[in-house]
């Protein structure tokens, strides 16, 4: 379901007021104060083309990219490590999200980590068997069932 606003490439504060949007005590959201093209209009294109079209620059004429490097903690975007790509996917905001339930422990995990989850559980079970000795194997197997 897409809202009317997401289908419109540019929407100013005046247009938002016309659709029934209220401003909170005279303050408008930053996105409503200026015309910014919708990122959906630039689907498949590099982000630099959207930045150029939006002309997003800081107040002191420093590029947005440079400001992000300097004010790392003030950013609203969290960067993910490349090593974690197998966990989060290539495009986490757009990828389908699935969860699976482990039948052994009823823990809910993402499919990407399910195999490693099962491996850890299996390792812990094997450690318990070897610690207790072969005479306790049948008792442990009965507990697991």
Swiss-Prot record:
UniProt cross-references to InterPro entries, sorted A to Z? Ataxin-7-like_regulator (IPR052237)
Ranges where the record places region Disordered? 1-31
The molecule here is called Ataxin-7-like protein 1
| Taxon lineage | Eukaryota, Metazoa, Chordata, Craniata, Vertebrata
């Amino acid at each position: 379901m897409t809202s009317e606003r997401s289908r419109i490439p540019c929407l100013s504060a005046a247009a938002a007021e016309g659709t029934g949007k209220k401003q909170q005590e005279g303050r408008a959201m930053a996105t409503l104060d200026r015309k910014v093209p919708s990122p959906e209009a630039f689907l498949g294109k590099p982000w630099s083309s959207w930045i150029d079209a939006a002309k997003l620059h800081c107040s002191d004429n420093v590029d947005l990219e440079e400001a992000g490097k300097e004010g790392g903690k003030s950013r609203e975007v969290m960067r993910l490590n490349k090593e974690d790509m197998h966990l989060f996917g290539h495009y986490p905001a757009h990828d389908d999200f699935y969860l699976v339930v482990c039948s052994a422990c009823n823990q809910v995990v993402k499919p990407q980590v399910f195999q490693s989850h099962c491996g850890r559980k299996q390792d812990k079970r094997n450690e318990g068997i070897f610690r207790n000795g072969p005479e306790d194997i049948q008792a442990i197997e009965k507990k697991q069932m």
